[in-house]
A protein has these predicted regions:
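Membrane-interface coil-to-helix junctions
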Residues: 1-72, 94-118
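Intrinsic disorder/low-structure terminal segments
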Residues: 8-11, 129, 184
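Extracytoplasmic
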Residues: 18, 133, 179
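Amphipathic alpha-helical interaction segments
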Residues: 31-32, 174, 178
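Juxtamembrane loop-transmembrane helix junctions in multi-pass integral membrane proteins
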Residues: 54-58, 84, 150, 184
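Membrane-embedded helix bundles of polyisoprenyl
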Residues: 69-82, 86-176, 188-208
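Membrane-interfacial, low-structure loops and terminal tails that flank and connect transmembrane helices
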Residues: 178-185
Length: 208
């Protein structure tokens, strides 16, 4: 699938082989692999599907389906967490998915860029759901960022995702306490930031 930027691999198994190391040895003189583009869960699963099915159509279908399904699911979970009725939550999630800005973005079929629109609502939902349980907040927030590590491949979008988490935490903290308790807000931020660093240490090292 040639999506946005026109350099998306068609063969996920070959991509996994080419980008699983800290050094790209096949691109001219070589370059440092600064992001987990070949070692994320997405490529591992797509490569597995490709090898099990022996049919590239299945892996590509799963890719396109997941690019559109996960943003919808993330926003639906957020809407249900704030006690919207199922139909209202469905409509909110559907609008999030099909509004012109998001739909045009997803139509590029660039999973590394487009996945950030799924990551942000998932992190909002996890922060809201486990706000009062520090251990679960730490674990599920960190695990989700690791699973979606490929969404941080585009570094400016990675910054946007982390800023979104900070803003989400501010909103949730105010919502839970009915006022802004800055000491608690800072404590929660340290928890999610620590979770992000610890669970993603395996690829963050390449940035330094």
């Amino acid at each position: 699938i040639l999506g946005g930027e026109g350099n998306i691999f068609l063969n996920f198994t070959e991509q996994l082989k080419a980008t699983s190391y800290q050094w790209f040895s096949v691109y001219g003189q070589g370059m440092i692999n600064l992001a987990p583009s070949g070692t994320g869960v997405n490529v591992l699963l797509l490569s597995l599907l490709e090898n099990l099915s022996k049919n590239p159509f299945i892996a590509n279908f799963v890719l396109v389906f997941s690019l559109h399904y996960f943003p919808f699911l993330g926003m639906y979970l957020v809407a249900r967490e704030i006690n919207l009725r199922p139909l209202s939550a469905f409509l909110v999630a559907l609008f999030y998915l099909i509004n012109p800005s998001i739909s045009q973005y997803l139509n590029n079929l660039n999973q590394w860029n487009a996945s950030v629109v799924a990551l942000m609502p998932f992190l909002f939902w996890i922060t809201l759901r486990f706000y009062k349980d520090n251990l679960k907040l730490f674990f599920f927030y960190g695990a989700t960022t690791a699973i979606f590590s490929f969404a941080y491949t585009n570094q400016p979008l990675g910054v946007i995702a982390n800023l979104s988490s900070l803003i989400s935490l501010y909103i949730i903290s105010f919502h839970v306490n009915k006022k802004m308790v800055y000491s608690e807000f800072l404590k929660k931020y340290v928890i999610i930031l620590s979770a992000f660093i610890l669970f993603n240490f395996w690829w963050l090292l390449n940035l330094f």
